[in-house]
Amino acid sequence: MAMATQASAATRHLITAAWSPSAKPRPATLAMPSSARGPAPLFAAAPDTPAPAAPPAEPAPAGFVPPQLDPSTPSPIFGGSTGGLLRKAQVEEFYVITWTSPKEQVFEMPTGGAAIMREGPNLLKLARKEQCLALGNRLRSKYKIAYQFYRVFPNGEVQYLHPKDGVYPEKVNAGRQGVGQNFRSIGKNVSPIEVKFTGKNSFDI
């Protein structure tokens, strides 16, 4: 018992020194990897390939002057979103449709939702040509409004697209050249076996 008391007395100063209250505890720090601090901001990489050159525009029919695009034309009043332009708009092209409204009225957007067209000229940017056609057909059928749309390239070049000769395709236009037109019935085509392996179609002969 006395030996145990002497041993504890001999080692008490060591324990006191090791657990001295004067020694301030050091706060533990946790080094977090950069991936745990939150997602890193994403930036769109610049395209490696240069923007393709615009294809040569077809000559306009004689007597028709394509209308010029005015970039200062106001857009319709729309509180929603058209979904933005596609990625290809930065490296290829996007489309612009214009029309002139006799009054301020509500119309349906091809991307969903309703917007208010302004009285006078309107301009709307869309990502696809099919969206311009859908909106244009609606403007002509319901509102009796003529429209035009254009293709805009990344370098700023504007190409007039539709209606190509100033008259919509479903209308007759004197002097318009037919494409793939054959003035005969399908029963008067040659037999397909006669043109097999020739690289031609029965309606081409």
From Swiss-Prot:
Keyword Chloroplast recorded: yes
GO BP, one annotated term: photosynthesis
Keyword rRNA-binding assigned: no
Annotated segments matching region Disordered: 18-66
Membrane-protein topology: Peripheral membrane protein
Composition skew (Low complexity), residue ranges: 39-48
SUPFAM superfamilies noted in UniProt: Photosystem I subunit PsaD (SSF64234)
Keywords: Chloroplast, Membrane, Photosynthesis, Photosystem I, Plastid, Thylakoid, Transit peptide
Domain of life the protein comes from: Eukaryota
Compartments, record wording: Plastid, Chloroplast thylakoid membrane
Gene Ontology, cellular component aspect: chloroplast thylakoid membrane; photosystem I reaction center
Induction: By light.
Pfam assignment, any one: PsaD
Known function: PsaD can form complexes with ferredoxin and ferredoxin-oxidoreductase in photosystem I (PS I) reaction center. PSAD may encode the ferredoxin-docking protein.
Similarity comment: family membership: Belongs to the PsaD family.
This protein's name: Photosystem I reaction center subunit II, chloroplastic
Phylogenetic classification of the source organism: Eukaryota, Viridiplantae, Streptophyta, Embryophyta, Tracheophyta
